[in-house]
């Protein structure tokens, strides 16, 4: 998601980062989501849980009134089926535009996932880990790179 992408930027710059998202479409309970996010950050700060080492959290908040929200659950990520296909359209200026299709339906929404937690009214918190270098395959590419010229013949 774009929210996780933005938080990832902070993480990659060494900043503890949180991606807060409200589950489902609509803004009906955006105040409840904002209050929940604010309280989580204040709690982390007051309990000195933020620290200086970078970390990345994905937090999904159900779209429901504040009094209906349940506790925070630590979760793994659920999985989705593939997204719908992109839709090709023309802009008013005649340029080609691509609308990315809707996210796919849940493929794994079992207990322990963020999908399951939010479907049952809980705030889902998932620690993420992301680095752009695939360290486990560096050895392979070190050998392979020496066989490449990088110049068209």
PLM feature spans:
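Hydrophobic/aromatic ligand-binding patch that stacks against planar heteroaromatic rings
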Residues: 6-10
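Charged helix-capping and loop-helix junction motifs
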Residues: 1-5
């Amino acid at each position: 998601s774009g929210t996780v992408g933005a938080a990832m930027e902070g993480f990659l710059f060494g900043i503890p980062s949180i991606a807060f998202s409200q589950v489902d479409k609509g803004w009906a309970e955006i105040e409840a989501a904002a209050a929940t996010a604010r309280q989580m950050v204040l709690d982390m700060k007051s309990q000195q849980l933020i620290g200086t080492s970078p970390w990345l959290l994905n937090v999904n908040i159900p779209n429901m009134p504040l009094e209906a929200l349940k506790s925070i659950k630590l979760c793994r990520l659920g999985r989705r089926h593939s997204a719908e296909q992109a839709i090709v359209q023309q802009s008013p200026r005649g340029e080609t535009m691509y609308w990315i299709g809707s996210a796919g339906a849940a493929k794994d929404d079992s207990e322990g996932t963020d999908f399951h937690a939010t479907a049952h009214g809980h705030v889902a918190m998932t620690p993420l880990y992301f680095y752009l270098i695939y360290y486990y395959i560096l050895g392979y590419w070190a050998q392979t790179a020496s066989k490449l010229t990088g110049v068209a013949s």
